[in-house]
Regions:
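Catalytic alpha/beta core domains of metabolic enzymes, predominantly
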Residues: 20, 28, 33, 58-175
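Active-site-proximal beta-alpha core segment in soluble small-molecule metabolic enzymes
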Residues: 1-47, 52-61, 65-68
């Protein structure tokens, strides 16, 4: 743990129920002990399913009429903000926490990060997950990141490209 420059915690896969908070806090405390920053990396593909089910049910019970995409976006934001609060309670300083919320479609990324920027002043790490191969992945990433960066949203970026079959994994570095 001491050799790493930064830790990444995905709140959706550190455990379920009460174990989730305990395991999340344990990682944060290790970061505190080693004076390391943490990126809270929420990913649409690994959201806390208890949170998603609760929000879907709330949408149905209250007849809110929200789409599943809107609910997933809200869940990502809520997960990131709640995890940030837990990280702070676990001893991390505000300046040690970076937030990312990765989705695979540019409009969703823009929506999520605009709302995150409205609700928090934590540094934001931008990037699409599963952006795609080649020119599609580059175009989707450039489109989403360009809009957000032009608005002053985002502190670090990553372009994640899917390698072509048999292709060089380094292509995403060159992007």
């Amino acid at each position: 743990a001491a050799a790493l420059d930064k830790y990444r915690i995905n709140p959706g896969n550190v455990g379920r129920g009460t174990k989730r908070d305990i395991q999340f806090s344990t990682i944060c405390k290790i970061a505190v002990d080693n004076n390391k920053p943490v990126r809270i990396g929420v990913n649409v593909g690994s959201l806390n399913q208890e949170l998603v089910m609760r929000k879907m049910q709330e949408n149905t019970d209250r007849d809110l009429g929200r789409s599943s995409d809107e609910i997933l976006n809200d869940c990502m934001i809520l997960s990131a903000l709640e995890s940030t609060e837990l990280a702070l309670r676990s001893g991390l300083r505000k300046d040690q926490i970076i937030i990312s919320c990765k989705v695979s479609r540019p409009p969703h990324l823009i929506t999520v990060y605009r709302e995150l920027a409205r609700q928090t002043d934590q540094p934001l790490h931008l990037g699409l997950t599963e952006a795609g191969m080649g020119i599609k992945g580059l175009t989707w990433s450039a489109t989403a990141l360009g809009v957000l960066l032009e608005e002053g949203i985002g502190d670090t970026i990553r372009v994640s490209l899917t390698p072509r079959p048999g292709g060089d994994r380094c292509d995403e570095v060159y992007a």
